């Protein structure tokens, strides 16, 4: 994970991405938050996640919808674009509705708008 840090050189980050692509349990790349790795790795984590196929991403849709709560967060636009490519049927709709209800409960207007934008594109 340390090699995905945006403070590393481009070469080190490229090596980090190469190694990360080999990780099978990619859920570790869903907005990690610990002492050393948090927003500083999210851009590269989003790249890894966005490369996955729809079927692999399906169980993690709520986490992806949560990532676009604030499009200023590192990696959020990458995830937004990946969600736009996702086939909007079945679990996508269920996950979207679940997270939209959460955004409504929080009265988070920005998040609700982001969710509407990603669904209607």
How would you label these PLM feature ranges?
Residues 10-22, 42-55, 66-70, 74-86, ...:
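Structural detector for internal amphipathic alpha-helices that build alpha-solenoid repeat scaffolds
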Residues 1-41:
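Terminal domain-start segments
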Residues 1-2, 23-34, 54-67, 88-100:
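Amphipathic alpha-helical scaffolding segments comprising HEAT/armadillo-like alpha-solenoid repeats
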């Amino acid at each position: 994970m340390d090699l995905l840090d945006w403070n590393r050189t481009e070469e080190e980050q490229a090596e980090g991405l190469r190694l990360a692509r080999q990780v099978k349990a990619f859920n570790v790349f869903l907005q990690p938050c610990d002492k050393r790795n948090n927003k500083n790795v999210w851009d590269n984590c989003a790249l890894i996640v966005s490369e996955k196929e729809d079927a692999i991403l399906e169980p993690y849709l709520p986490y992806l919808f949560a990532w676009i709560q604030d499009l200023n967060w590192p990696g959020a636009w990458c995830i937004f674009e990946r969600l736009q490519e996702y086939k909007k049927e079945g679990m996508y709709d269920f996950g979207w509705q679940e997270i939209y209800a959460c955004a409504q409960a929080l009265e988070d207007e920005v998040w609700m708008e982001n969710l509407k934008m990603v669904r209607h594109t």
